[in-house]
Regions:
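Bacterial Sec-dependent N-terminal signal peptides
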Residues: 1-29
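Subset of outer-membrane beta-barrel
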Residues: 27-384
Length: 384
């Protein structure tokens, strides 16, 4: 399917960036008002789209739940606590499938535990945005473009104590929206690229009590601003996520997990008079994003999203999952329920499925599904 893009904006980059932001995050903007809720709109938003089916089924919560290979995305510190020595996963998400048929997100991840409470991992995150047809202001075709974005990530996790671990991701990100296209009166487009880092902590309060609590904290996509050509510089989606998970082993075969994640984009809030955002530096934008909302602390709180999730695991083989994601109306109004199942075979191979059901009737995210295939090998080395 080919999607037409009319180059009518003053800046081609701004038009494309807003299109991608609104589709990728499913934001609802008030008709006739440009970003009336002052929604932060960084570029490369695919970096904040949930890649795996397990967390997707739990309301997009994952920073504090038990570790698996997809901890590379949610909280790499959890890799040091993984109960397997080696793991791999492949995930597939057809994106906006109610609107188009050629957009998809792919993710490949793997990790290896080593001695002394350490682990190393990698992931490849690829977002195929399909074929776009650009047109000039007069409607003349300016060519077809296959828009794509990807991130290559390497991870390291280390236990600092029996309960606390630290994680680090280093990643290369590339965003190619329209190749080298140049419209009338605009600078030539070029792929945006950058190097970014993630930092995370994971605390596992292991105990013999009825409930076990785990905590996670993650600051992701720490990087400079990027450009698609010309003088404009754009923030990438630096993100702060904190969460807690409560785990109860009902008996030898039944296990319950409940989790809560709070999430905030650490980029400047666009002002009432300047909907394009701030000219501050990337680091200044991270720290300033906690205090820059024009309506004060109340508006800052509205920029947090909430993810609630639950998982029932039977005999470490079959899982039922559910969750709810909530975003305030002013800052995007994404609200949806999530459901999913998981299946393990021979304690080595796994299959996860997730399905999204929005609360509204016109969400572009309606009927989003995700599929993940996993493989893991038992850890035969003594735990440190």
């Amino acid at each position: 399917m080919t999607t037409k893009i009319s180059i009518l904006q003053r800046s081609l980059l701004s038009a494309i960036a807003l299109l991608v932001c609104n589709f990728a995050i499913g934001q609802t903007l008030v008709s006739g008002q440009l970003n009336s809720g002052r929604i932060p709109t960084p570029t490369m938003l695919f970096m904040n789209v949930t890649p795996d089916a397990r967390s997707a089924a739990m309301g997009d919560a994952g920073v504090a739940i038990s570790s698996d290979v997809n901890a590379i995305y949610w909280n790499p510190a959890k890799l040091a606590s993984a109960d397997k020595d080696l793991g791999f996963a492949i995930s597939y998400t057809p994106w906006l499938r109610n609107l188009v048929n050629d957009m998809a997100l792919y993710n490949i991840a793997g990790y290896k535990k080593t001695a002394k409470g350490q682990a190393f991992g990698f992931s490849i995150n690829y977002f195929d945005q399909g074929l776009f047809q650009a047109t000039t202001a007069t409607g003349t075709s300016a060519g077809n473009f296959n828009s794509k974005e990807y991130a290559l990530t390497v991870s390291h996790a280390r236990k600092l104590s029996n309960t606390l671990s630290l994680g680090l991701n280093l990643k290369y990100i590339n965003s190619n929206l329209l190749g080298n296209y140049q419209g009338a009166g605009t600078s030539a487009m070029q792929p945006a690229q950058t190097v970014a880092a993630d930092l995370s902590l994971y605390w596992n309060n292991t105990s013999e009590k009825n409930w076990n609590y785990t905590y996670g904290l993650m600051l992701s996509n720490i990087s400079g601003k990027v450009s698609y050509g010309g003088l404009d510089k754009n923030f990438i989606p630096t993100n702060l996520r904190a969460g807690i998970a409560a785990v109860k082993n009902v008996d030898d075969k039944n296990k319950l997990t409940f989790t809560l994640d709070l999430n905030k984009l650490m980029v400047p809030t666009p002002t009432k008079t300047d909907p394009t955002g701030s000219n501050s530096s990337a680091i200044g934008g991270i720290f300033g994003s906690l205090f820059d909302a024009e309506d004060g602390f109340g508006e800052e709180l509205k920029e947090f999203t909430t993810s609630l999730g639950a998982e029932y695991l039977f005999n470490n083989t079959f899982a039922l999952r559910g969750g709810f994601f909530n975003e305030t109306e002013m800052k995007g109004n994404r609200k949806y329920f999530t459901f999913g199942v998981g299946l393990k075979l021979d304690q080595k191979y796994g299959f996860d499925f997730a399905y999204l059901v929005p609360t509204g009737t016109s969400s572009p995210l309606a009927n989003t599904l995700r599929v993940t295939l996993l493989a893991a090998i038992n850890n035969d080395t003594p735990k440190k």
